Amino acid sequence: MAEITASLVKELRDRTGAGMMECKKALVEANGDIELAIDNMRKSGQAKAAKKAGRVAAEGVILARVENGFGVLVEMNCETDFVAKDAGFLGLANEVADFAAANKGTTIEALQAQFEEKRAALVAKIGENMNIRRVAYLDGQVIAQYLHGAKIGVLVAGEGSADELKKVAMHVAASKPEFVNPEDVSAEVVEHERQIQIDIAINSGKPKEIAEKMVEGRMKKFTGEVSLTGQAFVMDPSVSVGDFLKSVNTSVSNFIRLEVGEGIEKKEEDFAAEVAKITGGNA
């Protein structure tokens, strides 16, 4: 039996909005598998669509560069927001981004090796760990970029107007689509969601045959919600992003979205523990 920790229960609560006891029970039944627990809670009606995993905890910056025919996003992390605004940290981060743009296709390992000496020197000077974490390239005829406070970076590739593609990049930053078009949603993802929806309908008392027919309409809605062109456009929710693109004679071939600290869990300490740490245990 897997250990059901308080942090695991908290994560399930954050992602489902369900009560503490329901979350703990679901985790016990799923032997600590949080994704299975979410699926089971959705099937039983205890939770609706759960939030995606990927709690943002680490600090740092996302930087973007757009060259002729491609763009690049670079993420550099540090431990505190204070250091994320430090001139030395930002200077190194910009050097990294410039190098990545000038040397298209550089891997994250090569990028880390290239700047290891400077990174180590800055760590020694500032006294805080930092890391070049991710680099992502995107090719395209037209590339638009959008940075939201250096915490979220988006590149959108397509054809048509760069100005209109920038509006789409802003939408991607806000709405977090996972695919470009509804038809791009993988068969595995569709089947997984379809089975959950069937089980929800059956658990509500519907016969299996009726449940399967009901689900077809729900699946069309689902693929639209997770795809860029199927989502309601944030600047005009009365139209989809796809409809907006058609109206301005512009198309999207691909996009990349990075957010500082995605998937990194920062250790949390309560106030008493933090004071004790600072005072050497004499809280």
From Swiss-Prot:
InterPro entries hit by this protein: EF-Ts_dimer_sf, Transl_elong_EFTs/EF1B, Transl_elong_EFTs/EF1B_dimer, Transl_elong_Ts_CS, UBA-like_sf
Keyword annotations of the record: Cytoplasm, Elongation factor, Protein biosynthesis
Alphabetized PROSITE patterns for the sequence: EF_TS_1 (PS01126), EF_TS_2 (PS01127)
CDD domains, per database record: UBA_EF-Ts (cd14275)
Gene Ontology terms for molecular function: translation elongation factor activity
Region of interest (Involved in Mg(2+) ion dislocation from EF-Tu), residue spans: 80-83
Keyword Protein biosynthesis: yes
Gene3D superfamilies listed in its UniProt record: 1.10.286.20, DNA helicase RuvA subunit, C-terminal domain, Elongation factor Ts, dimerisation domain
KW Cytoplasm (keyword) present: yes
Primary localization: cytoplasm
Source species, domain of life: Bacteria
GO cellular component: cytoplasm
Entry's localization field: Cytoplasm
Family label: Belongs to the EF-Ts family.
Known function: Associates with the EF-Tu.GDP complex and induces the exchange of GDP to GTP. It remains bound to the aminoacyl-tRNA.EF-Tu.GTP complex up to the GTP hydrolysis stage on the ribosome.
Protein name: Elongation factor Ts
Originating species: Haemophilus influenzae (strain 86-028NP)
Gene: tsf
